């Protein structure tokens, strides 16, 4: 929300594409849609207890759960039409959803191992909210890439150097 911060193109919200903002992304979504983001003076860093009050991303999850937060600024008022679906001691809007616009935001980090139900949150967004099919597998990606390479290279030979991400 700082002066000069990049803005989102408002046309994005007219596309009907389910959108999930995580941490700063949630703050940005809230601001773009008329919500409020402030520095509360009580930032959170690390594991916090979060209270969940329903919501599509939290279906069949415990009402109290641990989440990993890393922020000084936070959404203090969700956009009009959005429901607050999770809070923590210092974060009045730990998660919000606007089903009508397909906009969802979480202040915490569902992608890290320190958020035990984080993968469930992401799966719920992908499958229940966005309607994605769980058909992706590493083997399928590998097979697809081999087919693409064979189509391009034909009977020629290829030298491939591949990093496993540990170098």
Name these PLM-found stretches.
Residues 1-2, 6-20, 27, 31-167:
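RNA-binding accessory domains that recognize and position tRNA/RNA substrates
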């Amino acid at each position: 929300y700082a002066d000069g911060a990049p803005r989102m193109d408002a046309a994005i919200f007219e596309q009907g594409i389910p959108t999930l903002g995580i941490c700063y992304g949630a703050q940005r979504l809230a601001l773009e849609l008329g919500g409020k983001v402030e520095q509360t003076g009580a930032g959170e860093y690390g594991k916090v207890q979060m209270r969940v009050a329903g919501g599509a991303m939290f279906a069949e999850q415990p009402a109290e759960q641990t989440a990993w937060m890393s922020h000084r600024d936070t959404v203090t008022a969700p956009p009009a039409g959005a429901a607050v679906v999770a809070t923590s001691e210092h974060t009045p809007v730990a998660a919000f959803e606007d089903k009508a616009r397909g906009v969802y935001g979480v202040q915490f980090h569902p992608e890290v191992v320190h958020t035990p139900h984080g993968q469930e949150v992401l799966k719920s967004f992908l499958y229940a909210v966005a309607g994605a099919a769980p058909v992706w597998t590493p083997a399928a990606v590998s097979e697809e890439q081999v087919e693409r390479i064979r189509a391009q290279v034909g009977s020629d030979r290829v030298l491939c150097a591949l990093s496993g991400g540990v170098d």
